Amino acid sequence: MPGLAATRWLARLEAINVILDEWEPLKLHFEMAASKERCYTAQELFDAYKDPQNRLYLLFIRKVLKEVVRVDKIFQSQNADITKITDDLLDMYRSLMQIVVDSHYLSKCTKENLPDLNFINYILPVTGNTTINFGYDFNCFAQSCPLNKEQINHVKERCKSFILELINQVKHRLPDNIKTLLMLKIFSPSNVTSQCKTSIVPIASQYRSSFPDIDELENEWKSISYIQWPQECFKDIVSFWAEVNEYTNSSGEKKFPNISALALSLLSLPFSNASIERIFSQMNVVHTDLRNRLQVRSVEALLQILMV
């Protein structure tokens, strides 16, 4: 049996994949353990593997978690493009709603308004002509398994409760400044260097206390398009804006001080706590029982060595 990822946020989907892929061997294993060793836990697990309802339920969960884990990996990445990460999050949120919400109603909502969408009256039923999308694997197994219609509908209701709770939990975790984060797309190098690009005024006006001269910001924003930037700086958005920030005119003065300061300030917004979790994980490795009396400075020094 393949080992699971030690990282806790990756283990759940992999656990479901292993259970489903090794269903029959695991079922046989626990049956033998229950009969030969008279193990109560093995008997409980064997009873769970005997029930096709559990397998049907896990097939639905696997379908749902694939997209969730994909986006979660993006947030765990240290090199994610912050201008696209909010779009990925909302795309995942919409894909979850597409499973259970009427598509005609959902299509009328723009991406930035998805967090405020009240869809409670547009939830699809589990039976009928237009139903919740339970997935191909779920439907195939439902047709071939020995469950009756009532049992299958019971599983479908469980799946419906799961997806609605997942949508609710994701909604509670969406950032309050979602519209501001969506605006960060305009700072992508491809948009910045385009002759036909989005105006900087809507986002700049929100930070007028820090950047009062909107006209100067707009002039710098338009002038960036006429500079031939080196191809090396297009590899990522941080490299690009670092290059813009260092660009000088003939007298050695920075040519884009305001727009680069605005862009770098917004691009430094935290979008994930993954780096903090990594530090705490490293601290747990460093701060063992033998090192329990280490002072804070010593722990900091060891962490800095590990993080280099």
Task: State where each predicted segment sits.
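Alpha-helical structural modules in large enzymes and assemblies
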Residues: M1-V308
